[in-house]
Amino acid sequence: MEEYKEIMQNKKGKVDVTPIANFFREEVKQQITKNCWKPRVVAFLTSDDQGAIDYSKWTKLACQKDGIEFILKRVERVDLEDLIIEANNDSCVHGILVYYPVFGGMMDSYLQDVVSPTKDIEGLSTQNRFNLYHNIRFMDGETATKKCVIPCTPLAMVKIIDNLGIYDKSLAMGEHLKGKTVTIVNRSEIVGRPLAAMLANDGAIVYSIDINGIIIFQSGKRHGTIKMSETNVTREEAISKSDILILGVPSPNYKVNSDLIQDGTIVINFAGCLNVDESIQEKSILVPTIGKVTIAMLERNLLRLFNNQISNK
């Protein structure tokens, strides 16, 4: 994008992702207007967590502004499963969004699978995650008319990296990040692990770090497969050799030492708190927040599912 040309040339500075988010939201808005579509989302909020409440407000405002009917329901968590099933069976509902955590742990994983994959705008169901890890692009197999959805936050970061001009489109599909080293400090099933798989699928070597250690993600021998391997590389070594560093530790006490980060590294932060000192922008490229692009990807996923559903009628 032209907005980032100077930052990328200088290999330092702070990136505001608003232009990227606006680009994709404008695409969504144009499709809705052109086709006279009326997509509807039902979102469930069970928590009093201020972060979840704020995110639900931002999502609702963005969707309504872009022509999406957004119904936000404050519900008791013990009632959530029945309400999700009700929304699954409602033909007027095209997307379902749950603000996690609800119970936490395996109970939340269960709820993610209660949401029908055909309405799972977050892409968190087992089927959607299986499709991602096996690079399956369509929900209807060889018919290839119903596109899969990808988890919103990982997809947002891929789009940010792409719009910063890091993807080499002159290379073959699956090699656009060939020669790039990425470190992700987060291996959650919602963000870190799917993101590692996506970037590895695009040709990068990915160091995936969590409290249990480091795993390397690379593209496998067969197209669309991922190879995982153990490594003796330390956290500090992985960070210091990275072209792209992605941080997602939900603690204000976690900070990466700026001395470990090489000049010109792209540092993307998706945690609610900044996992690196803001002064890193004086020698590297800092993307401090990605939330606006995540919401844009949510809208994009909704339209994909809406289109899949109306094609059945």
Swiss-Prot record:
Source superkingdom: Eukaryota
Transmembrane segments: none
InterPro entries xrefs: Aminoacid_DH-like_N_sf, m-THF_DH_NAD-bd, NAD(P)-bd_dom_sf, THF_DH/CycHdrlase, THF_DH/CycHdrlase_cat_dom, THF_DH/CycHdrlase_NAD-bd_dom
Catalysed reactions, semicolon-separated: (6R)-5,10-methylene-5,6,7,8-tetrahydrofolate + NAD(+) = (6R)-5,10-methenyltetrahydrofolate + NADH
A single GO molecular function term of this UniProt record: methylenetetrahydrofolate dehydrogenase (NADP+) activity
GO biological process terms, semicolon-separated: one-carbon metabolic process; purine nucleobase biosynthetic process; purine nucleotide biosynthetic process; tetrahydrofolate interconversion
Presence of keyword Disulfide bond: no
Keywords, comma-separated and alphabetical: NAD, One-carbon metabolism, Oxidoreductase, Purine biosynthesis
UniProt-listed Enzyme Commission number(s): 1.5.1.15
Pathway recorded for this protein: One-carbon metabolism; tetrahydrofolate interconversion
One GO CC term on file: cytosol
Active site: C152
UniProt-annotated binding residues for NAD(+): R187, S188, D210, I211, F270, A271, G272
Family: Belongs to the tetrahydrofolate dehydrogenase/cyclohydrolase family.
Job of this protein: Catalyzes oxidation of cytoplasmic one-carbon units for purine biosynthesis.
Subunit annotation: Homodimer.
The protein, known as: Methylenetetrahydrofolate dehydrogenase [NAD(+)]
Species the sequence originates in: Dictyostelium discoideum (Social amoeba)
